From Swiss-Prot:
Keywords for this protein: Aminoacyl-tRNA synthetase, ATP-binding, Cytoplasm, Ligase, Metal-binding, Nucleotide-binding, Protein biosynthesis, RNA-binding, tRNA-binding, Zinc
Cofactor: Zn(2+)
This protein's name: Alanine--tRNA ligase
Metal-binding is among the record's keywords: yes
Taxonomy of the source species: Bacteria, Pseudomonadati, Pseudomonadota, Gammaproteobacteria, Enterobacterales
UniProt enzyme class: ligase
Organism for this UniProt entry: Photorhabdus laumondii subsp. laumondii (strain DSM 15139 / CIP 105565 / TT01)
Reaction it catalyzes: tRNA(Ala) + L-alanine + ATP = L-alanyl-tRNA(Ala) + AMP + diphosphate
Job of this protein: Catalyzes the attachment of alanine to tRNA(Ala) in a two-step reaction: alanine is first activated by ATP to form Ala-AMP and then transferred to the acceptor end of tRNA(Ala). Also edits incorrectly charged Ser-tRNA(Ala) and Gly-tRNA(Ala) via its editing domain.
GO annotation, biological process: alanyl-tRNA aminoacylation; negative regulation of DNA-templated transcription
Matching InterPro entries: aa-tRNA-synth_II/BPL/LPL, Ala-tRNA-lgiase_IIc, Ala-tRNA-ligase_IIc_anticod-bd, Ala-tRNA-synth_IIc_core, Ala-tRNA-synth_IIc_N, Ala-tRNA_ligase, Ala_tRNA_ligase_euk/bac, DHHA1_dom
């Protein structure tokens, strides 16, 4: 009996564990400390700094089953998913790694033992082929002489991509840096499947499938192209779990392995489709639920930017394929539970966040469902009008902008009809929109665009509020100067300073730079490369380069900022506890007045959730835990559980800020000494800033206490107005509102009675025009909203009639036309009111029996009403 996918994953890890490898958990799909990478797309990503010599581990051998996503960015398999046997947005990469430990001989021997060993995968040796780099004689000899593969199944691959070392069998991280040859292992599915061995004209067929790539990091490539041998060569290998499972389960498509068979069956059930492993839509959905669920689990939330937009594209592609299968209701979120069953031990983290993942997927599907049908109809209409086989970029952009159709979803629909999308035209339309947004945003120029500073400033503000320093540079109007005079604004650079430069959401310090001859008032502090710039105005004297000054921060302002920054950390931790671990920081502002925190979450917070978060933060404030700062290497910080901002680039040494066991984050800002210093934390606003992004604004310390006093004062004022006290205020206000509601109802009844009386008197004023009753009247002291009631009453009284009523309120004319049903074939209310409205500078419309309009030309009203009789007569 074949091994299951879960058993194969575990067997791989167990094998390398017996060979002295550390089993390392899969890292997040969101790469930490590598802003160049959209998603984790290979097993070596989490070891990149180790291979570069910038990080050290306690082990020299490692093995992983790494979750990977290839959708968006350089590595994008999205458009092929569902249409081929082996493309996926999500896959698991099995890998073993040597950091300066073993090299080619052991790497090849381990791979062969695992693949062919009777206690392991037990593949037929004659089914395996290998490739090596053209000049890698060492690897060739190991395969031929040590392993014993016949020469005819060992293929040398040269520079087959048009440049030196540009080869399928030569790996390089970039134009320079670590690189080296690789050897790949292929499985031969047999003669019944079309395709040739690697390097042959038929190599793109499905007969010979690559199952393992073993990279030998052997050289350091210099800018001039020379290759220098590395002192400690390393090994990086990768084997797709889904591919090796297909081989071991004797199937030709990844979608036929047990994991996908089970998922596809569930997809068919929830969409009402026929269970068919070859159905492209079933394949797409089964693949996409894996990438979507694990991306959300790792903190990505659907949005219109960056990683969030890639996730949104994948979700919407799945929803559209569900629509094709006939799914009538939301279905995608229902696949999370069955996904957990097939993932086994690899889904433990997903299991903890199952409810959150399901809710995010359901919300996203409900939002897209509102526009999906209309968007598909528009696309169908455009394709029906198409004379060629290319859909223009403007239409693709309109589908994106109006209906939320990612361009690849539009391309997906078009491909089914052998039509392509002008993606270049789409990109132009997208860039035009971005340019318009930039032009209308009013954002100023970045400080770093204004001046270039070569100096370096040492920051002492963690421990000091003032600092004796020397002026190393002065900039006025973006130019370097040696001296400034009283009244001049400038940026002053010091060799060392206690002033914190704006960073990580915390605003820059303010204060005074002074000596016996001058005083420079600092209103802001910013970074300029390695220098810290003090922005402000010289209030008196003369300040020159090389002057010695005393730099003193505004301590009261800094203290307020410190409290708000520490409260931000507590807020972040509390949100993750109350809302779920999908919450991650998306932006922040910390100043002396308040804090603002943007975070990923799929819906508005409920009032009770806001209260729970506020209570949790205040409980930690009352704990009065020490705020501890430690310097450590980044890897140690990760092990300690410190939260880092995804996409941020950190130095080798990082500052880790801890508040008891409640919060641990990487942070370079200034903070309170103890959580109790915060005093009181109050949330003053919660709102949305973009799809999937929420914002909380909060205050602390004195500001929070002041807000409590203000609320109490307001309650007391209201209590006095309604003749109550604070304790019974709610009941008193409720009684007052009930009374007001009753009076409004009574007033409306009186108005209705008045309207009925007026209607009775008006009915007698109707005249006959060609045998039809016509009533035209301008009313005084009548509210516009009463006109409709009066028309209905007059219809009942007159039986058959045309009624035109008007009134003037707030310097505006209100008109209404009513026509009884028996007359609408000749006189349509909408046409009549348009004729009258045009004469008073207005417009209107409605049904054939009732229409309303408004206008601004009061003086023209009498003549407009006089014209009604002639208009009616001409149509009878």
């Amino acid at each position: 009996m074949s091994k299951s996918t879960a058993e194969i994953r575990q067997a791989f890890l167990d094998f390398f564990h017996t060979k002295g490898h550390q089993v390392v958990p899969s890292s997040s799909l969101v790469p930490n400390n590598d802003p160049t990478l959209l998603f984790t797309n290979a097993g070596m990503n989490q070891f990149k700094d180790v291979f570069l010599g910038q990080d050290k581990r306690s082990y020299s051998r490692a093995t992983t089953a790494q979750r990977c996503v290839r959708a968006g960015g350089k590595h994008n398999d999205l458009e092929n998913v569902g249409y081929t046997a082996r493309h996926h947005t999500f896959f698991e990469m099995l890998g073993n790694f040597s950091f300066g430990d073993y090299f080619k001989h052991d790497a090849i021997s381990y791979a062969w033992e695992l693949l062919t060993g009777k206690d392991w995968f037990n593949l037929p040796k004659e089914k395996l082929w290998v490739t090596v780099y053209q000049t890698d004689d060492e690897a060739y000899d190991i395969w031929k002489n040590d392993v014993g593969i016949p020469a005819e199944r060992i293929i040398r691959i040269g520079d087959n991509k048009g440049a030196p070392y540009a080869s399928d069998n030569f790996w390089q991280m970039g134009d320079t840096g670590p690189c080296g040859p690789c050897t790949e292992i292929f499985y031969d599915h047999g003669e019944h499947i079309w395709g040739g061995p690697p390097g042959s004209p038929e190599e793109d067929g499905d007969r010979y499938i690559e199952i393992w790539n073993i990279v030998f990091m052997q050289f350091n490539r210099h800018a001039d192209g020379t290759m220098e041998p590395l002192p400690k060569p390393s090994v990086d290998t990768g084997m797709g779990l889904e591919r090796i499972t297909a081989v071991l389960q004797h199937v030709n498509s990844n979608y036929e392995i047990d994991l996908f068979r089970d998922l596809i069956t569930v997809v068919a059930n929830v969409t009402g489709a026929t269970d068919d492993l070859s159905n492209k839509s079933l394949r797409v959905i089964a693949d996409h639920i894996r990438s979507c669920a694990f991306l959300i689990c790792d903190g990505v939330v659907p949005s219109n930017e960056n990683r969030g937009y890639v996730l949104r594209r994948i979700i919407r592609r799945a929803i559209r394929h569900g629509n094709m299968l006939g799914a009538k209701d939301t279905f995608f979120y229902k696949l999370v539970a069955p996904l957990l069953e097939v993932m086994g031990a690899a889904g433990e983290e997903l299991k903890r966040q199952q409810a959150v993942v399901e809710q995010i997927l359901k919300t996203e599907e409900e939002q897209f469902a509102r526009t999906l049908e209309r968007g598909l109809q528009l696309l169908d209409d455009e394709l029906a009008k198409l004379s060629g086989d290319i859909l223009d970029g403007e239409t693709a952009f309109r589908l994106y902008d109006t209906y939320g159709f990612p361009v690849d979803l539009t391309a997906d629909v078009c491909r089914e009809r052998n039509i392509s999308v002008d993606e270049a035209g789409f990109a132009v339309a997208m860039e035009n929109q971005r340019r318009r947004a930039r032009e209308s945003s009013g954002f100023g120029t970045d400080y770093n665009e204004l001046i270039k500073v070569d100096e370096r400033s040492d920051f002492s503000g963690y421990d000091h509020n003032e600092q004796q320093a020397t002026v190393t540079a002065i900039f006025r109007d973006g130019e370097s100067v040696n001296q400034i005079q009283a009244g001049e604004e400038a940026i002053v650079i010091l060799d060392k300073t206690a002033f914190y430069a704006e960073s990580g959401g915390q605003v820059g310090d303010s204060g005074i730079l002074s000596n016996t001859n001058c005083a420079f008032c600092v209103i802001d502090t910013q970074k300029y490369g390695q220098a810290i710039g003090h922005i402000g105005k010289l209030e008196k004297g003369t300040l020159s380069v090389n002057h010695n000054i005393n730099a003193v921060i505004d301590i009261e302002r800094r203290d307020a900022i410190r409290l708000n920054h520490s409260a931000t950390h507590l807020l972040h931790a509390a949100l993750r506890q109350i809302l779920g671990e999908h919450v991650s920081q998306k932006g922040s502002l910390v100043n002396d007045k308040y804090l603002r925190f943007d975070f990923s979450h799929f819906e508005a917070m409920k009032p009770e959730q806001i209260r729970l978060v506020e209570d949790l933060v205040n409980a930690e404030v009352r704990q009065n835990s020490p705020v501890v700062t430690e310097l450590m290497d980044l890897e140690t910080a990760k092990v300690k559980g410190a939260m880092a901002l995804f996409g941020e680039k950190y130095e080798e040494q990082v500052r880790v800020l801890s508040m008891g066991d409640f919060s641990t984050e990487l942070c370079g800002g200034t903070h309170a000494n103890r959580t109790g210093d915060i005093g009181l934390f109050r949330i003053i606003a919660e709102s949305g800033t973009a799809a999937g992004i929420r914002r909380i604004e909060a205050i602390t310390g004195k500001k929070a206490v002041e807000s409590v006093h203000q609320q109490v004062d307001l309650l007391q004022d209201i209590a006095q107005l309604v003749k109550s006290d604070i304790h019974s205020l709610s009941e008193k206000v409720r009684m007052t509102l009930d009374r007001a509601k009753a009076l409004e109802k009574e007033l409306q009844q009186l108005k209705d009675q008045q309207a009925a009386q007026e209607s009775s008197s008006l009915a007698s004023k109707a005249k006959e025009v060609k045998g039809v009753k016509l009533l035209v009247s301008q009313l005084s002291n009548t509210e516009p909203k009463m006109l409709r009631t009066m028309v209905d009453d007059l219809k009942n009284q007159l039986g058959s009639a045309i009624i035109v009523l008007s009134t003037i309120s707030d310097d505006k004319v209100s008109l209404i036309v009513g026509v009884t049903k028996d007359l609408t074939a000749k006189i349509r209310a909408g046409e009549l009111i348009s004729s009258v409205a045009q004469q008073i500078g207005g417009k209107g419309g409605g049904r054939s029996d009732m229409a309303q309009a408004g206008g601004s030309d009061i003086e023209a009203l009498p003549s407009a009403l006089d014209s009604v009789e002639e208009w009616v007569a001409s149509r009878l």
